[in-house]
C-alpha cells in the first residue's frame, strides 16, 4: 500500500517563518508579484526543512493557510466572514475563533484553493531535468528517490464547525451545512487528482473530537461519500486527533468512542494521535492495520521536549508488537503549525533518524 515499511510523513502544516508572519501583518505594502514571491519563499523554506529531515512524504507546510481549515472559507461564497475574534485576552484557546454567518447558498466556483497550492509544491519540489527550464508535466512519473508530495483538505464536517446554521436557507444545523459542503470538498479532491496529486489527506479532526457524543457511523457515511469519487485514484489518508489550536485539545482524548465504526473509513492510511497520550490505547492499531496502513503520532507537537532518535526507536518497537512493519507509518501527533520552527525541525530530524535505526535492525 506504500513505497516501503516504516514510512515517515507529516500531517500537513508547518510553522510559518517569522518573516512570513510579519509580512502577513503588512500585506497592504506588497504588490501581487511581491506576495507571490513571499509565498514561494515560505513554501520553499518549509519544504527544505522537511527534505533536510529526510521525510518520505512532504507537504507545502500549508504556508498559504492562516489556520488548517479557517482559510478555506475565503473561497466559499454565501458566507459573511467574522470580522474579529470574540475573545482577545486571556489564555489562548478554541473560543478565540468565532463563527461565520451563512447568508446565501454555499458554493465554491473557484474551488477551495488547494490545487494552486499543490502545483506550487510540485514546481518547487521537483528538480529540473538536465538543467532544462521547461516545466515538468503534472502527470510525470516521480523522480527516483524523490519524496511523495501530499496535499491536505479539511472534510465537510470539520469545515461546517465554523459556520452558523441558517434555517431560512435550508441549513438548520451542522449536519445540513455538512451536506452542503460535502460536494464542494469532493470536487476539490477530484481536481487535485486531475492535477496529478498521488496522496491526499482528508482530515476530519472534528469527527474524532465529537465521536464520544455523536453517532460515529454517521461520520463514516459522511467521510466515505466525500472521498468516493477518488477512491483507488490516489492514496487517501485521514488524521484523527483531539484538537491542536494554540496547542490545546478540544475533545476527550480517547480513541475508543470512534471504534470499531471508524474501521469502515475507506482510506489507505489512518493516523492516530499517540505521543501526547503516552501511547494509550496503542492496541487499537492492530485492527487499524488489518484494514489499512496505521500512521502513528510518534512525536508530541504540544511539548518542547525534543524526542531523541533512541526515544523514537523505542516507541517504534512498541508499535511493532501490535502491527507489522509494512503496515506502519510514523508522523507527528498533529500538524506542526503550533510548534516553534526550531523545535519542529529537530523533532522531524530525530523522528527520521529513529525510524532509520529500526529499519536497520529489521533489515528493511
Sequence positions of predicted segments:
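Intrinsically disordered, low-complexity proline-rich regions
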Residues: 129-132, 137-140
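Domain-level signal for soluble alpha/beta catalytic cores
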Residues: 1-129, 143-364
Amino acid at each position: 500500500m506504500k513505497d516501503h515499511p516504516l514510512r515517515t510523513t507529516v500531517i500537513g502544516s508547518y510553522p510559518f517563518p517569522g518573516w512570513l508572519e510579519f509580512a502577513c501583518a503588512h500585506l497592504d505594502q506588497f504588490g501581487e508579484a511581491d506576495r507571490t514571491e513571499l509565498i514561494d519563499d515560505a513554501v520553499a523554506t518549509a519544504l527544505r526543512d522537511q527534505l533536510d529531515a529526510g521525510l518520505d512524504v512532504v507537504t507545502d507546510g500549508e504556508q498559504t493557510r492562516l489556520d488548517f481549515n479557517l482559510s478555506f472559507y475565503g473561497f466559499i461564497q454565501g458566507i459573511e466572514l467574522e470580522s474579529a475574534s470574540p475573545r482577545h485576552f486571556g489564555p489562548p484557546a478554541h473560543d478565540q475563533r468565532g463563527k461565520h454567518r451563512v447568508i446565501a447558498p454555499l458554493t465554491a466556483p473557484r474551488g477551495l484553493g488547494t490545487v494552486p497550492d499543490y502545483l506550487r509544491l510540485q514546481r518547487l519540489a521537483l528538480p529540473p531535468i538536465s538543467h532544462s527550464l521547461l516545466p515538468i508535466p503534472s502527470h510525470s512519473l516521480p523522480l527516483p528517490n524523490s519524496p511523495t508530495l501530499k496535499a491536505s483538505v479539511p472534510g465537510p464536517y470539520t469545515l461546517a464547525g465554523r459556520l452558523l446554521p441558517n434555517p431560512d436557507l435550508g441549513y438548520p444545523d451542522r449536519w445540513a451545512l455538512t451536506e452542503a459542503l460535502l460536494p464542494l470538498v469532493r470536487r476539490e479532491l477530484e481536481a487535485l487528482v486531475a492535477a496529478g496529486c498521488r496522496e491526499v489527506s482528508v482530515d476530519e479532526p472534528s469527527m474524532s473530537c465529537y465521536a464520544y457524543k455523536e453517532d460515529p457511523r454517521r461520520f463514516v457515511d459522511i467521510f466515505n461519500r466525500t472521498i468516493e469519487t477518488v477512491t483507488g485514484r490516489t492514496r487517501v489518508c485521514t488524521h484523527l486527533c483531539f484538537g491542536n489550536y494554540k496547542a490545546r485539545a478540544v475533545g476527550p482524548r480517547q480513541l475508543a468512542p470512534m471504534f470499531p465504526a471508524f474501521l469502515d473509513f475507506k482510506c489507505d492510511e489512518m493516523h492516530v494521535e499517540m505521543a501526547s497520550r503516552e501511547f494509550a490505547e496503542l492496541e487499537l492499531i492492530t485492527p487499524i492495520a488489518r484494514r489499512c496502513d496505521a500512521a502513528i503520532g510518534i512525536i508530541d507537537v504540544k511539548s518542547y521536549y525534543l524526542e531523541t532518535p533512541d526515544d523514537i526507536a523505542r516507541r517504534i518497537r512498541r508499535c511493532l508488537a501490535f502491527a507489522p512493519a509494512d503496515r506502519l507509518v510514523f508522523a507527528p501527533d498533529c500538524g506542526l503549525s503550533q510548534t516553534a520552527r526550531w523545535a519542529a525541525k529537530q523533532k522531524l530530524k530525530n523522528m527520521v533518524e529513529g525510524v532509520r535505526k529500526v529499519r536497520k535492525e529489521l533489515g528493511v
